Amino acid sequence: MAFDEPACHTCETTLVSRLFCFSCNALQPFPREIDFFEVLGFPVSFELNSAELEERYQQLLLELHPDFYSSAPEAEQLLSETASAILNTAYKTLHDPTLRAGYLLHLLAEKQQLDESSLPEGFLAEMFFLQEELDELLDSVNSVELSAMHDDLQNRKMNIEADYVPLFKKHDDHPENSEILQQLQSHLNAERYLRRLLERIPTTD
């Protein structure tokens, strides 16, 4: 489990999600500092089964929906609204590989001081070159070359994303090595650069 297997405050059944008990259908009080893996009941790991994540989200979305608690006591209505909001944020974060990587890095780094502006060696110079190239293509409105550049940037982004799994596994094997977390931070920074460049390229229908 992603947490220390707390029990339902009503029936004492071990919880899947910290937000709701599927055994007795009771909303659960939860701590202010709750991590998103606890919310959806998954181990703290970068690798997630996307189908299981979607299924768990839909289950909880239905059970927590405020409409079901419209006639409940005010405290329970508020708990439902808060839990639903947290659920949506948790799902959005864990569903997206980049957001999940950034969130997991935040959990793992704890009080470590990471260089949040670091980039892979040579990446920044390459980005300056690509940015100038993109500026020229946007000025010329060359749709063919813009499309080719979009594909190139997308491939670069996917290559960075492909490194997340082995890097997180490496950290699992060597949790004392802070350099691995710094590598992950650099990869995330690089991917943000690429995303910003991609966002500048007009989409075509």
State where each predicted segment sits.
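C-terminal accessory/regulatory regions appended to core domains
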Residues: 1-205
